[in-house]
Amino acid sequence: MARYKLTVCYDGSDYYGFQRQNNLPTVQQKLEEALSTRFQRQITVHPSGRTDAGVHAIAQVVHFDVDSEIKTSSFGYSINTLLPKDIAVTSCEKVSDEFHAQFGAKRKTYLYKICLCKIHSPLKRKYFHICFYDLNIAKMQDACKFFEGEHDFRAFMLANEEKENTVRTIYALSVEQADDEIYIRVTGNGFLHNMVRIIAGTLVDVGRGRIAPEDIPKIIESKRHVGTGKTLDPQGLYLESVEYI
């Protein structure tokens, strides 16, 4: 039995997240169907993590086991003929049996995209959070440093969710603007459910003047979701990269 690592890009617009669900289209379902067809046996994929409905991935990582040798250099081309056009395998690599896409991941980077629009943008609605008001980018950038480091991010998950360990480390958080588009990029050792979208919403509130940058440490220390910005839309979120040793 051999283990293979796939890097997968997908447009999450028409899927109910990554994880397989009964009677609902998901990315995992489409991947497993394609792989099972290719190898003529049931294949299960194990992702670096689950993405929610509407969330995209530039480079999701999964692994699977199969008792066949794969020509990795051309596997992406062949398997993509069995996948829908909104999912693509961009690389294939044979790995050791000890490799695990989820438990071996050391860093993940997410990208959140915001479009500053005066009117609704039909062409960007599936790929950006649409923002109809001006934002102070300098203040948003100033707030980033308060998120970096190891903190208990309990405030940055939904209030009705339970999680034993809510301590995470953010290695880098940045805000950049290019014309009418804003890119929030965050790298960490792991993220709570909705954490990136809540951080993005909090930075938007900083940009609107609703939250002062220097108030971020107090919000983190409070461990209460009530002080944060809202959870921004899923369609602006992209899993950009997953790093391993």
Give names to the regions the model predicted.
Residues M1-I245:
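Structured-RNA-binding interfaces characteristic of tRNA pseudouridine synthases
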